[in-house]
Amino acid sequence: MTRVLILSWEYPPLIEGGLARHVRKLSEALVERDVEVHVLTRGGEESPAEERRGGVVIHRIREPKRPTDLGEFVAWVERMNSDMLAAGVELGDRYSFDLVHGHDWLVANACDHLAKRFDAPLVTTIHATEHGRHQGWVDKHPQTYIHGVERWITNRSDRVIACSHYMREQIADIFGVDEGRVSVIPNGIDPDDLQPQDEEELTRLRSEFAAPEEKLVLLIGRLVYEKGFQLALEAMPRLIEEVPGTRFLIAGSGTHEAELHKQAEELGLMEHGTFLGWIGDDVLHSLYKIADLTVVPSIYEPFGLVALEAMASGCPCIVADTGGLREVVPHEEVGLRFPARDPEALAEVAIRVLSDDELGRNLVAEAYEHLRRFDWGDVAEQTAEVYAGLVGEASRA
């Protein structure tokens, strides 16, 4: 049985974004495939230093005090890595790890040192790049530092995992990594998380945001520039004019939140929608079921999990024609795409779906088979194959 140490800066119940959910689902699915999984992460005082959950052994360091100044974030990450390294060394004395698997730049330093100490292969999953998040502008701190760490760790790793072919090309081009060392393994979804819920409760929830005869447009994600919510707001006046009674619902939080509120006020949209802020998974999954349309207007998108979850929940979706969204949403098959950064095109496609209920139903129906590609079992199987190949190579060396 392969024993792997996975490092992630977040893991439930500590959730910053999608990474925590991804690592948990992957870890638990790997356990079902006879991989012994240990996760090294951070946690608050309320979380146990060590526990077994879903078959995964979770080890937590106490979280260093979080800085309020973004400029101090890099130093905070370095302290976290130092603490993780110390904890990882102790774990290495207790267990014999066959492989180290790190997620993103935030744990790169600790991963590299631990892999060398254990004389074990190193796998790194790159979920997004700083270069992509900032459209290539990485000449200022902390972007320069983060970009440098990403380049360094991808070239140090024995194998890099990317969530889409788009990301594999980006990693190869930006960091100079041989594409042969980059495995494409998509993110997964768990249909059980998206099962139908009490209809009365869903009706009550929808009534908080829209009347029965109105159309509800949903946007979910971190409120940051690269997610493109500002483009969706720019498209809303025309959408409301063409499809009277259209309302929007934005769920998420982030550094761009105040600007989006200001933009909505300037466009006269505040009476036509709601900013929900950060929400938990239970509410998140319900929102897909009460919406008439999910919009993913990203400027930069390595994968596109929101689109997958929307389709799996029976909600039609339209997405920007960019990045991994091209692979997740085949155009005119399971969803519709519009040119990225084009609010007019976004409005036109949204109007088309909201004005044609049959089109929406057909898109959702066609998505059923497509979604089978993203089952967590398959994702874990592909990951376990990467592990087995590297461990086998190491044993023969």
Residue ranges, per PLM feature:
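N-terminal subdomain of nucleotide-sugar transferases
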Residues: M1-V57, S395-R396
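A short helix/loop element that forms part of the nucleotide-sugar donor recognition site in Leloir-type
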Residues: H141, Q195-A210
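Carbohydrate-associated surface elements
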Residues: Y166, G188
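Short alpha-helical donor nucleotide-sugar binding micro-motif in glycosyltransferases
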Residues: W278-I279, S286-A291
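Aromatic "clamp/platform" in nucleotide-sugar-dependent glycosyltransferases that forms part
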Residues: I299
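Short hydrophobic beta-strand element within catalytic cores of glycosyltransferases
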Residues: P316-A320
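Conserved acidic donor-binding segment of nucleotide-sugar-dependent glycosyltransferases
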Residues: H331-E332, L336-P343, R352-D357
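A short, well-ordered alpha-helix in the C-terminal region of glycosyltransferases
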Residues: A345, R352, L359-R373, A384-E385
